[in-house]
Amino acid sequence: MNKLLQCHQVSKIYREGEFETEVLKGVDFELEQGELVAIVGTSGSGKSTLLHILGALDDATHGEVAFLDYQLSALSGNKQAQVRNQHLGFIYQFHHLLADFTAVENVAMPLLIGGKSPKQAKLAAEALLEKVGLQHRMHHRPSELSGGERQRVAIARALVNKPALVLADEPTGNLDHKTALQIYDLMRELNRESGTAFLVVTHDNELAAKMDRILYMQDGVLASDNR
């Protein structure tokens, strides 16, 4: 398998006046193309901070992240935004759908931002919503959808640009257990079909066990890597 992402000695220090808090401490790991990986650990262990750095949403204080052919820290802000739009997908505990837009409009948005025509964007969004089982709900707004349906829309939006990697931060945290299992099964199915890699932060050990590999974070350190 080919290396998709390489994280080398990544540290993150937050400074406020003369006080420093080291949130990440020399994190090292690699992610292969098409892998399905969970990151687990207690609250405050650095999981979400690591995900933000891997997604070029924040900068490491020390260390390097290589993604595809890019050294993320060497890119301009505009180039980082382009990489996020074209090669990365994001899913969060809260769906972050735009309330005034329908499901299909929300899913089409990244394509429109990336320069696709409205017709191309709509067709691609409709195809993905059908794939996640929402063909009958695509013209509904988020307020008209259940929690599980909203998260399916968020997953479709994350995948619409056919990213190499999806970063998911507690994607089932607001869902009941049955719906959470359905969302994880959907992510695994889409992973098999598209070859998109998933890196998922979760507190749920049962759901993490469904992944190909589990990374354990503790006090800002990658404590173990179980394949």
Curated annotation (Swiss-Prot):
The lineage of its organism: Bacteria, Pseudomonadati, Pseudomonadota, Gammaproteobacteria, Vibrionales. Part of the ABC transporter complex LolCDE involved in the translocation of mature outer membrane-directed lipoproteins, from the inner membrane to the periplasmic chaperone, LolA. Responsible for the formation of the LolA-lipoprotein complex in an ATP-dependent manner. One of its GO terms (cellular component) is plasma membrane. Its EC number is 7.6.2.-. GO terms for biological process: lipoprotein localization to membrane. Gene3D superfamilies: P-loop containing nucleotide triphosphate hydrolases (3.40.50.300). GO terms for molecular function: ATP binding; ATP hydrolysis activity. Belongs to the ABC transporter superfamily. Lipoprotein translocase (TC 3.A.1.125) family. This is Lipoprotein-releasing system ATP-binding protein LolD. It is found in: Cell inner membrane. Pfam families: ABC_tran. It is an enzyme of class 7 (translocase). Keywords: ATP-binding, Cell inner membrane, Cell membrane, Membrane, Nucleotide-binding, Translocase, Transport. ATP binds at residues 41-48. The complex is composed of two ATP-binding proteins (LolD) and two transmembrane proteins (LolC and LolE). It is a peripheral membrane protein. Residues 5-227 form the ABC transporter domain.
